[in-house]
Regions:
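C-terminal regulatory/oligomerization modules of transcriptional regulators
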Residues: 1-8, 128-150
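Residues within helix-turn-helix
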Residues: 56-57, 68, 75, 95
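Alpha-helical linker/hinge and terminal dimerization helices associated
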Residues: 17-20, 24-28, 63, 106-125, ...
Length: 150
């Protein structure tokens, strides 16, 4: 048996992660309440994980999307009452975005709605298997996050 080269193995890892991402996002989105998309949920989740307030530009940079794409996502979230977009009092042009109580509620509802999917995953893979891959995935994410400006 011929062993794959290191670069082939690395490519296979990235390929698998990409496919898993597509499949997981589709499965996750089918569980989301209130017509929420994965992109919208991700923005709500960012406010819980990272910071309570941000400019649209900061969010666009964090998600590596255009300002226009982020503005569209924020507009849809604001229409649903899940974020508040208001002028920055210290700037005539900038806006500040925060998650609302309804946004926090729908985020929690989304996490609750995805529990059956997560439980189904645990019927195929035990928690030790899942926990074992986390350190590598976290390190890879951190490495790629540091490189994003390169």
């Amino acid at each position: 048996m011929v062993m794959p080269s290191s670069s082939e193995s690395t490519f296979r890892v990235f390929n698998e992660i990409g496919i898993i991402s597509q499949l997981a996002n589709n499965a996750f989105e089918s569980c989301l309440p209130d017509g929420l998309t994965v992109s919208q949920f991700s923005v709500l989740n960012w406010f819980i994980r990272v910071d309570v307030e941000a400019t649209p530009g900061r969010l666009a940079a964090a998600f590596m999307v255009t300002k226009g794409a982020m503005t569209n996502t924020l507009k849809r979230l604001a229409e649903k009452g899940f974020v508040d977009v208001r002028p920055d009092e210290n700037s005539g042009r900038r806006k500040l975005v925060t998650i609302t109580a309804d946004g926090q509620r729908v985020r929690l509802a989304a996490l609750k709605a995805v529990e059956p999917l997560l439980e189904e995953v645990l019927t195929q893979f035990n928690s030790a298997q899942i926990s074992a891959c986390l350190p590598f995935l976290e390190q890879l994410r951190a490495f790629l996050d540091l490189r994003r400006s390169v």
